[in-house]
């Protein structure tokens, strides 16, 4: 329902993976504004150098795949979405804040996708303040053991409802807990069942070659 209601997608954090944005507009033909300051300068030259050097260890198709990824990247962000080479964070730190990204969108409500490697904590208060403009959010929280209280406070104070939690299996701590988790929030979500099944059938491992991480819930 959140996807059906949204008029625009603001996507924070792209890198070399824009599958979420592709899938989103495949279901809903809307405006997409993406933000990532890192995909310029030496980002692509370093990417190509690594892929071409990987031929030396037998990955003969790596250069071809590198060119293919770059070509698709350029096509998507020239024809399907607008890419701002800006760093998201608190305005007082000189970064682009949430308010500015929302001002660039004429129609509301907006869906947010946030994966900005720890800077998400700088804009949590802004997300809460602008919650009436939002219909859904997917956000990845990093270094969660250091920010448990902030995450709990955000969940309790945000007017959208937490509908799904996905552990990122790329990195785990000494207690087999994920160092990052992905959370999905929706406005007025439709209840589908009285039972919650985790992992959800649509869940996918972030890194297929690594083991699945089980979520451990505690009383709030």
Give residue spans per PLM region.
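SAM cofactor-binding core of SAM-dependent methyltransferases
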Residues: 1-94, 107, 143
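Conserved acidic-Pro-Pro-aromatic motif
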Residues: 8-10, 20-33, 43-46, 99-220
């Amino acid at each position: 329902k959140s996807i059906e209601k949204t008029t625009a997608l603001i996507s924070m954090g792209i890198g070399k993976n824009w599958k979420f944005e592709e899938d989103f507009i495949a279901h809903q033909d809307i405006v997409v504004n993406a933000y990532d300051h890192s995909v310029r300068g030496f980002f692509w030259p370093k990417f190509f150098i690594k892929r071409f050097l990987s031929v030396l260890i037998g990955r003969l198709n790596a250069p071809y795949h590198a060119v293919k990824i770059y070509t698709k990247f350029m096509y998507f962000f020239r024809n399907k979405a607008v890419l701002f080479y800006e760093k998201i964070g608190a305005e007082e730190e000189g970064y682009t804040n949430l308010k500015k990204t929302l001002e660039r969108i004429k129609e509301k409500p907006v869906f947010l996708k946030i994966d900005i490697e720890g800077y998400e904590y700088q804009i949590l208060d802004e997300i809460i303040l602008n919650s009436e403009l939002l219909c859904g959010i997917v956000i990845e929280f990093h270094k969660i053991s250091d920010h448990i209280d902030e995450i709990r406070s955000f969940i309790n104070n945000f007017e959208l409802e937490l509908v799904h939690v996905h552990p990122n299996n790329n990195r785990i701590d000494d207690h087999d807990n994920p160092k990052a988790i992905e959370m999905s929030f929706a406005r007025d979500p439709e209840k589908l069942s009285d039972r919650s099944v985790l992992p959800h059938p649509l869940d996918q491992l972030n890194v297929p070659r690594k083991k699945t991480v089980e979520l451990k819930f505690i009383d709030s």
